[in-house]
């Protein structure tokens, strides 16, 4: 079976390399940096949905002395421990809180993270109690099972292991040294920090300046509501900051007459704060998730927006995006109309994003958008997409209305149909795929490839050999389509490159993974012209796969 690169081409639609100043919660891919595991030397880009989960971290109580006695001491001069399958259980079992990076030596993003991670480890050694950072080469054969156990799908993946390894979560913090230190110090403490009734105004100021902060207000710090709040804080602490108090008057926009119990979520967007008095744990989680996310996500260079951007692209629902120049004289008018559309149609499971064209270059390349068509509205649904180029502010609401009513025609990305197509391996594009493959009445072997994929480059001469060998058979076509430059119809499940499908003249569509010219020719010979349901097709597919 051919090894495959993930089907999503580079670059991802978020900033590809944040500056030191902008490396906040951005993990250019855990959506990252997040390249999926791949062949050494070929850094495979993870898809947008690849969406590795980011979660939490917390208190560490083991003394650093235990670390010095562990069999896997860090290399001389290194603060980061080096672990492997042989000592992982022993070292993790000696700590109530330990941070582990799963990396690959050939991964460029891992190499960028390394000095920041090392600096953070050195700084956290003096924390009371010390916070331990470790690393595992997940690409080494010895450690592949270990990586699988911890759900590693991309490099680097950082995991937080608690209670001597009994619980683990993905790291959800910044990737610069200072950010790592601050995040882990906070996570190593209690899930929610108490704000004393006698707190000075700076306590309120810190809440106002900390992004989304969830504050529980209680008559006393006990009872079922308080316990429910603390349980949710423990579960969601990776993504949100939690505080609690018995005096609402110390809070921003506080009111000493409010006695609680209630939860007040502060945020730097939309209505600035919102309250809830439902302490059912599931309901409280949903309240925090929905209220703590902007009605419209902003795609710009601000570090504060990166975590919302990541969550936006992780979401599997329909996405509506407005791209324009934020320096445009009418930018505010566009914002107003787009926010109105979001307020009207968010209930239709549509999430909204407004992006500055300068900051969104990755998105333009990823989605095949054209800067010359800005301002534009781009809607990405599960199996189709829609583009409204050079849109006017007053056209935004009607366009969204048409989409929700199902009257818009989908946009199909396609390269131009070749004027000359006389090579042994024929070129197929989205606009002529049905004609060449499904409606030609011929037996067609179609490869979906990516120009940057090394595995595809190795397959190319093999397909050329097959095409030349079968050139005298007018009923056989060997073809290829660039899956990064053309939309792939839902008839095909292309999850990696190369992907091959054989469509027989009898109407059978079969996935195939031949390795050699001989195998591919034999497969085509056995299956060409077969009718649906014929035994030869079923048996030959079993033989080949």
UniProtKB/Swiss-Prot annotation:
Site annotation (Lowers pKa of C-terminal Cys of second active site): which residues?
A: 515
State the InterPro entries in the record: Prot_disulphide_isomerase, Thioredoxin-like_sf, Thioredoxin_CS, Thioredoxin_domain
Q: Which GO terms describe its cellular component?
A: endoplasmic reticulum; endoplasmic reticulum lumen
Catalyzed reaction equations: Catalyzes the rearrangement of -S-S- bonds in proteins
An example of a Pfam family matching this protein is Thioredoxin
Give the GO terms filed under biological process for this record: protein folding; response to endoplasmic reticulum stress
Q: What is this protein called?
A: Protein disulfide isomerase-like 1-3
